[in-house]
Amino acid sequence: MDFGLALLLAGLLGLLLGQSLQVKPLQVEPPEPVVAVALGASRQLTCRLACADRGASVQWRGLDTSLGAVQSDTGRSVLTVRNASLSAAGTRVCVGSCGGRTFQHTVQLLVYAFPDQLTVSPAALVPGDPEVACTAHKVTPVDPNALSFSLLVGGQELEGAQALGPEVQEEEEEPQGDEDVLFRVTERWRLPPLGTPVPPALYCQATMRLPGLELSHRQAIPVLHSPTSPEPPDTTSPESPDTTSPESPDTTSQEPPDTTSPEPPDKTSPEPAPQQGSTHTPRSPGSTRTRRPEISQAGPTQGEVIPTGSSKPAGDQLPAALWTSSAVLGLLLLALPTYHLWKRCRHLAEDDTHPPASLRLLPQVSAWAGLRGTGQVGISPS
């Protein structure tokens, strides 16, 4: 009888254990105890409970936080956090019950801000600079375990760089209303000698490490070479061709025709006019200017205009025009007194009482001609 009672108790215990094994614990997605959500983003948390008698109830609850939007049905509850703010961070608890038994699962919701806004100071390094600073703007959280900085060269941390510790300050922009307060964190390093050759750039890397999440942003810091090294090739290479090439052709090609061509026609052509040009001027350019045979063969004015025309077509037109205008002006000045003289002689010829000098000489000429015919020319009266 005792043996039968023992079997009965064992059967009942096995039945109870079987029912308990059929009841599964709560299933939460995502399963991590800490869930990170970006500031302004949205996230869903789903909680499920399977129960044999289909009488399970599941519900999300918040602890001193804004819970969010919750949709629940039999054995399932979904929590949605939209446009997450810093106030949405906190603890969420999923509570489920089945057959008189209660289960719960806790989730820590963490809201972070880590935009790609890194600035460096100075913007570019020169070998010998003592320090460099890197600042991450509008970030949270600022715990050193969550936010860290590193100074890299060639993908590895710069050896010998000494970190001086982060500086945390609130952003200068004042929050309005329910806006969240964000921070800027600055890390400074004391730089070692960069060595030779100098690397082209250093990199500031900021890393945000949260449970189930790791983000990194990187900002380049160019390294300029010493200012004295690039100057010699830059100054010597362009100056040598610039100074020698333009000066030699300018002085040799332009100066001789400028001094010889315009001066002689200005002095000789208007004064002698066409009378003395054939006797004097052809010899003077031949004797003084032995380099140009064209000047000795041509006339005084044309001989000096021809070489200028060959070298400078624009300069040839100006002396020729001056010579022509001077000649026309001289003819006009000579025509006016000639006309007045001719007019005066004409009036004297028409006047009977004042015959012209040519008419008064006629009797003497005729008398002299008569004496010559008789052979008495040259005999003085005695």
Swiss-Prot record:
<dbReference type="GO" id="GO:0006955">
    <property type="term" value="P:immune response"/>
</dbReference>
<keyword id="KW-0732">Signal</keyword>
<dbReference type="GO" id="GO:0043113">
    <property type="term" value="P:receptor clustering"/>
</dbReference>
<feature type="region of interest" description="5.5 X 8 AA tandem repeats of [PS]-P-D-T-T-S-[QP]-E">
    <location>
        <begin position="228"/>
        <end position="271"/>
    </location>
</feature>
<keyword id="KW-0812">Transmembrane</keyword>
<feature type="repeat" description="6">
    <location>
        <begin position="264"/>
        <end position="271"/>
    </location>
</feature>
<feature type="repeat" description="4">
    <location>
        <begin position="248"/>
        <end position="255"/>
    </location>
</feature>
<keyword id="KW-0677">Repeat</keyword>
<keyword id="KW-0472">Membrane</keyword>
<dbReference type="Pfam" id="PF09085">
    <property type="entry name" value="Adhes-Ig_like"/>
</dbReference>
<dbReference type="GO" id="GO:0050901">
    <property type="term" value="P:leukocyte tethering or rolling"/>
</dbReference>
<feature type="compositionally biased region" description="Low complexity">
    <location>
        <begin position="236"/>
        <end position="261"/>
    </location>
</feature>
<feature type="topological domain" description="Extracellular">
    <location>
        <begin position="19"/>
        <end position="317"/>
    </location>
</feature>
<dbReference type="InterPro" id="IPR036179">
    <property type="entry name" value="Ig-like_dom_sf"/>
</dbReference>
<dbReference type="InterPro" id="IPR003599">
    <property type="entry name" value="Ig_sub"/>
</dbReference>
<feature type="region of interest" description="Mucin-like">
    <location>
        <begin position="226"/>
        <end position="317"/>
    </location>
</feature>
<comment type="function">
    <text>Cell adhesion leukocyte receptor expressed by mucosal venules, helps to direct lymphocyte traffic into mucosal tissues including the Peyer patches and the intestinal lamina propria. It can bind both integrin alpha-4/beta-7 and L-selectin, regulating both the passage and retention of leukocytes. Isoform 2, lacking the mucin-like domain, may be specialized in supporting integrin alpha-4/beta-7-dependent adhesion strengthening, independent of L-selectin binding.</text>
</comment>
<dbReference type="GO" id="GO:0002687">
    <property type="term" value="P:positive regulation of leukocyte migration"/>
</dbReference>
<feature type="domain" description="Ig-like 1">
    <location>
        <begin position="23"/>
        <end position="112"/>
    </location>
</feature>
<keyword id="KW-1133">Transmembrane helix</keyword>
<feature type="transmembrane region" description="Helical">
    <location>
        <begin position="318"/>
        <end position="338"/>
    </location>
</feature>
<dbReference type="InterPro" id="IPR015169">
    <property type="entry name" value="Adhes-Ig-like"/>
</dbReference>
<protein>
    <recommendedName>
        <fullName>Mucosal addressin cell adhesion molecule 1</fullName>
    </recommendedName>
</protein>
<dbReference type="InterPro" id="IPR037413">
    <property type="entry name" value="MADCAM1"/>
</dbReference>
<feature type="signal peptide">
    <location>
        <begin position="1"/>
        <end position="18"/>
    </location>
</feature>
<keyword id="KW-1015">Disulfide bond</keyword>
<keyword id="KW-0393">Immunoglobulin domain</keyword>
<keyword id="KW-0325">Glycoprotein</keyword>
<dbReference type="GO" id="GO:0005886">
    <property type="term" value="C:plasma membrane"/>
</dbReference>
<feature type="disulfide bond">
    <location>
        <begin position="51"/>
        <end position="98"/>
    </location>
</feature>
<dbReference type="GO" id="GO:0007165">
    <property type="term" value="P:signal transduction"/>
</dbReference>
<feature type="disulfide bond">
    <location>
        <begin position="47"/>
        <end position="94"/>
    </location>
</feature>
<feature type="region of interest" description="Disordered">
    <location>
        <begin position="223"/>
        <end position="314"/>
    </location>
</feature>
<feature type="domain" description="Ig-like 2">
    <location>
        <begin position="113"/>
        <end position="231"/>
    </location>
</feature>
<dbReference type="InterPro" id="IPR013783">
    <property type="entry name" value="Ig-like_fold"/>
</dbReference>
<comment type="subunit">
    <text>Homodimer.</text>
</comment>
<dbReference type="GO" id="GO:0098640">
    <property type="term" value="F:integrin binding involved in cell-matrix adhesion"/>
</dbReference>
<feature type="compositionally biased region" description="Low complexity">
    <location>
        <begin position="277"/>
        <end position="288"/>
    </location>
</feature>
<dbReference type="GO" id="GO:0007160">
    <property type="term" value="P:cell-matrix adhesion"/>
</dbReference>
<feature type="repeat" description="5">
    <location>
        <begin position="256"/>
        <end position="263"/>
    </location>
</feature>
<feature type="glycosylation site" description="N-linked (GlcNAc...) asparagine">
    <location>
        <position position="83"/>
    </location>
</feature>
<dbReference type="GO" id="GO:2000403">
    <property type="term" value="P:positive regulation of lymphocyte migration"/>
</dbReference>
